[in-house]
Design a protein with these regions (language model features):
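Intrinsically disordered, low-complexity
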Residues: 35, 39-40, 45, 143-144
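Secretory targeting and sorting signals
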Residues: 1-35
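Serine-dependent carboxylesterase/thioesterase catalytic core
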Residues: 98-178, 182, 191
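Active-site catalytic motif of lipid deacylating hydrolases and related acyltransferases
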Residues: 40-115, 186-209, 213-218
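Non-catalytic, mobile gating and regulatory segments of ester bond hydrolases
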Residues: 28, 41-43, 151
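Phosphate-binding glycine-rich loops and adjacent basic patches that engage nucleotide phosphates
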Residues: 32, 60-69, 171-181
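Hydrophobic alpha-helical membrane segments, chiefly transmembrane helices and signal peptide h-regions
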Residues: 22-25, 127, 209-213
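A generic short-segment signal for beta-strand/edge and adjacent turn/coil regions
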Residues: 15-16, 48-51, 85-87, 122-127, ...
Length: 220
């Protein structure tokens, strides 16, 4: 075989090898560009922040809301309890906002088909207000929610929201949620209105948790 023929044969072999490598790379690298849902991702997940002095978990209002939502939909509904102190230091609400925002972003990445529902009661409502209304890091809030992650949130249900005393100002400032947000305030509740009935603040179950579940069920 002549030298020219050998060179031509080697060149053709190199081209075939490169083509095979590129094809393999396309198969390996191409598919992960589209997020894949991990096994076990629920159809819907409620991310809920409990009220002041409630023990860790969803809290009374959050638990009743999740139960009511499950009763109003045939979809698989999971839940996540926002991890934060829920104590008398209201500045710690930013801890909850960081945790809630981080979890929403995690779910958007790992369970892209799951519809997320944000919720909170009393101080927990303030936690979710921060997540939905604060587009930049400030005052201890380190993990603002990117707009693409916000798109995964189907609805927001807030109970006894402290910002209600200011006309739900935080909700009005929310750039990415608009009509997805339902703020519920019992008449006379001193936390979310100018009322003076403490029992009103403690009476969101079952009437208003059922109302919120009906609102959310229509969004998911």
């Amino acid at each position: 075989m002549s030298l020219a023929a050998k060179r031509s044969r080697a060149h053709n072999f190199s081209l075939l090898a490169v083509a095979a490598l590129l094809a393999g790379a396309a198969m390996v690298l191409g598919s992960p560009l589209v997020p894949r849902a991990f096994a076990g991702c629920p159809d819907v997940e409620v991310v809920f922040a409990r009220g002041t002095d409630e023990p860790p978990g969803l809290g009374k209002v959050g638990g009743a809301f999740v139960t009511a939502l499950r009763a109003q939909t045939t979809r698989n509904v999971g839940s996540y309890a926002v991890n934060y102190p829920a104590n008398d230091d209201f500045l710690a609400a930013t801890d909850g906002a960081n945790d809630a925002s981080g979890h929403v972003q995690h779910m958007a990445d790992h369970c892209p088909n799951t519809k997320l529902v944000l919720g909170g009661y009393s101080q927990g409502a303030a936690v979710i207000d921060i997540v939905t209304a604060a587009p930049i890091a400030a005052l201890g809030f380190r993990d603002p929610l990117p707009a693409d992650a916000a798109d995964h949130v189907a609805a927001v249900a807030l109970f006894g929201n402290p910002s209600g005393r200011a006309g739900n100002l935080m909700t009005a400032l929310s750039p990415d949620f608009g009509g997805k947000i339902l703020n519920l305030c019992n008449p006379g509740d001193p936390i979310c209105s100018n009322g003076n009935s403490w029992p009103a603040h403690l009476s969101y179950v079952p009437g208003l948790t059922n109302k919120a579940a009906h609102f959310v069920a229509a969004k998911i």
